[in-house]
Amino acid sequence: MAKTSTQPVGGWLFKEEPEHYSFTDLERDGDTIWDGVTNNLALKNLREVRSGDKVLFYQTGKDKAVVGEMLVTSDPRSDEKEKDAKLVVVDVRASKRWPRPVTLAEIKADPEFANWDLVKNSRLSVMRVSAKQWQRLVKLSQANP
């Protein structure tokens, strides 16, 4: 039986290149396997994700921004497509697209996020989001730019 979420944080943030797999693709597909994570710290974080956790979808590339929310629908498991046993995947489902994207520039300009991994460790593809940060991001997504 899968463990239920014990997430002590607001949730997680997963990054993806929209040319590879966009939030629109996820909305179309409904759900997908989140794979391709190879960085050791990102893998450590991904192993802590649990079914029921909330995740922000952050698009990288030209228009860096948080664009929507996902729900994790499985606990981490080995990536069956890879020979390296340390690589893990989770299943995710689209939850909702935000009213407007919250750009990296907005995030960097807000002191609330000064110590967040998204600002300090820009290469990290899976990271924690505190409840306070999550609430602030939601407010920003609802504001006029």
Residues covered by each model-derived region:
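Contiguous surface segments at macromolecular interaction interfaces
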Residues: M1-P18, D79-P145
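Compositionally biased, charged N-terminal/linker segments
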Residues: M1-S51, N144-P145
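A generic structural signal for short beta-strands and their flanking turns/coil linkers
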Residues: G10, G30, S51-D53, V66-G68, ...
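Short acidic/glycine-rich loop or secondary-structure boundary segments that cap or lie
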Residues: Y21-T24, K64-V67, E80
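Short acidic (Asp/Glu) patches
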Residues: G36-L41, S74-S78, P111
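Hydrophobic beta-strand signal
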Residues: L56-F57, L71
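Short, charged beta-turn/beta-strand-edge "cap" motif at the junction between a beta-strand
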Residues: Y58-K64
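Short beta-strand-centered aromatic/proline hotspots
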Residues: A65-D75
